[in-house]
Amino acid sequence: MAETEERSLDNFFAKRDKKKKKERSSRAANAASGAGGSSAAAGSRPGDGGSLGSGARSGDGGSSGSGARSGDGGSLGSGARSGDGGTSRSGDGGSAGPGGKAITKDENEWKEFEQKEVDYSGLRVQAMQISEKEDDDNEKREDPGDNWEEGGGGSGAEKSSGPWNKTALVQAPPAPVTVTETPEPAMPSGVYRPPGARLTTTRKTPQGPPEIYSDTQFPSLQSTAKHVESRNRYLK
């Protein structure tokens, strides 16, 4: 009984191992074929793609199967990594390998862009000449008096005609005002006189002694009383 149980267990594990190995080999073959097709279509790493594709095709018969069963997966691994297609269709891998490497090198290399030098000196001079002409035209438009003198009086008047270019009438300068200064009379030396006394001439009258009995020169209270009485009489 024990032997039969051991055999049944061995058979069971052997079947399970076979199924696992078959699944692994089929997965590896599918992965190799898919990788070979994608590399051949994209053009990247064609050496690896050729080795993988050749390995997948040749592995369908016996190499891949035997390698998977016996555990010797070195041929597939080495063929896929090193791109050595000697065992299966090495011509395909050899023909596509160097061309693909050259293409990848050209793509990876930097191409220096050389900018063409253009001479803009003529354009700059032309632009400066145009700007100078425009400045001259603007100056001629702003100064109609110069055009009048240069054109003889006809062109300037035509250009400056219009209500927006009316020139103000030139006013005659006012006549200068002449200020006449009155000469001052000569002053006698040594004596100061005020301005009012300088113009009036006074005659000197002989002065006699004062009149003591005159009321005008020597007024008194009695004379004022007499004056009041005489006034009252006239009023009555």
Curated annotation (Swiss-Prot):
It is found in: Cytoplasm. Its main location: cytoplasm. InterPro entries: CDV3. GO terms for cellular component: cytoplasm. It comes from Rattus norvegicus (Rat). Keywords: Acetylation, Cytoplasm, Phosphoprotein. Transmembrane segments: none annotated. Residues 27-45 have a biased composition (Low complexity). This is Protein CDV3 homolog. The modification Phosphotyrosine is found at Y120, Y213. The modification Phosphoserine is found at S8, S131, S155.
